[in-house]
Regions:
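Helix-loop boundary and gating motifs at the non-cytosolic
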Residues: 2-51
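Helix-to-loop junctions at the C-terminal end of transmembrane segments
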Residues: 57-69
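Short hydrophobic/small-residue motifs within alpha-helical transmembrane segments
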Residues: 51-52, 140-141
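Paired small-residue
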Residues: 95-103
Length: 142
């Protein structure tokens, strides 16, 4: 099984790093909101717009993959997520954060969609279950 995962190691490492980054961002956000004395409603809105962004992103995935391909789409989504994270660190306005969280939701779900689509496309039927099993272990360990 480990030999079957060899070609997928970079994608699995990327998934691990992305999920760890999302976990850190989701943990730091409430702490920053508390430091800014933001209300519970603002915290709820920030969470809501993130998942709204994920819903929007699912509608864009097919178009993005068809237009750009897996490698370019993944690189663009990870870069855009990084830019949003850096902007959130520089700007201390929860209302601006809502726009950034909306965008991060879109970019995150698109990156996940690209990874899973690529794993599905690149793996043969005989090892697909093992590949996706390893992917899910990596995602849940992060």
């Amino acid at each position: 099984m480990l030999t079957a995962l060899g070609p997928f190691r970079p994608v699995l490492i990327a998934a691990l790093l992305m999920m760890v980054g999302q976990g850190v961002m989701n943990s730091i956000l409430p702490v920053r909101l508390a430091q800014l004395d933001a209300s519970a409603q603002i915290a709820g809105l920030l969470t809501t717009v993130y998942f709204l962004g994920q819903m929007i992103g699912t509608r864009l995935g097919h178009w993005l993959l068809h237009r750009t391909g897996h490698i370019r789409a993944f690189a663009a989504m990870i870069a855009a997520t990084g830019v949003c994270t850096l902007l959130a660190a520089m700007i201390e306005d929860p209302w601006v954060w809502m726009l950034l969280r909306l965008a991060m939701g879109v970019f995150t779900v698109l990156a996940i969609l690209v990874m899973e689509s690529w794993l599905n496309m690149a793996s043969e039927n005989s090892v697909r279950g093992s590949v996706f099993g390893a992917y899910m272990v990596v995602v849940y360990l992060a």
